[in-house]
């Protein structure tokens, strides 16, 4: 005798749609989980990129703050260093004893200049150059026809820069062509 299963054909037919529904439900759940995983992965990657950008920005800001702190400290040393240079300029007109002292101070001044050089601070000369508002501050203007307009005639304080960026602009006297009104008034006086 052969045994037949107790399931009828109606039961088999009803179980098939049930398994189709289950399959569709599972596929839908799988698709939903994949979408959720992709969304969370995208959010994770975005957060990771934001964290990396923040780290880089903070590092850059820290470097800039250190650079500006060093620049400000160096700027504080410029006036006394320049005063020492001026004083040493007069040492040759004094006694031998003062000249000997001046030699020692000249060595100290050279050490200061070496520190500036090591930090990338460069002194720039302006006399005879064309006025550049990025590098110069015009504190005096002299009207003249002998020298091209915008030429720096005299430098009152030296300029210093690190790389291409000035940390202290040079204070200068600039040549300017006389204005027509000034020539007329000069001619009338003569």
Curated annotation (Swiss-Prot):
Keywords: Chaperone, Cytoplasm, Stress response. Homodimer. PROSITE patterns: GRPE. Residues 1-34 are annotated as: Disordered. Residues 1-31 have a biased composition (Polar residues). It comes from the Bacteria. GO terms for biological process: protein folding. Participates actively in the response to hyperosmotic and heat shock by preventing the aggregation of stress-denatured proteins, in association with DnaK and GrpE. It is the nucleotide exchange factor for DnaK and may function as a thermosensor. Unfolded proteins bind initially to DnaJ; upon interaction with the DnaJ-bound protein, DnaK hydrolyzes its bound ATP, resulting in the formation of a stable complex. GrpE releases ADP from DnaK; ATP binding to DnaK triggers the release of the substrate protein, thus completing the reaction cycle. The gene is grpE. Pfam families: GrpE. InterPro entries: GrpE, GrpE_coiled_coil, GrpE_head. This is Protein GrpE. It is found in: Cytoplasm. GO terms for molecular function: adenyl-nucleotide exchange factor activity; protein homodimerization activity; protein-folding chaperone binding; unfolded protein binding. CDD domains: GrpE (cd00446). One of its GO terms (cellular component) is cytoplasm. Belongs to the GrpE family.
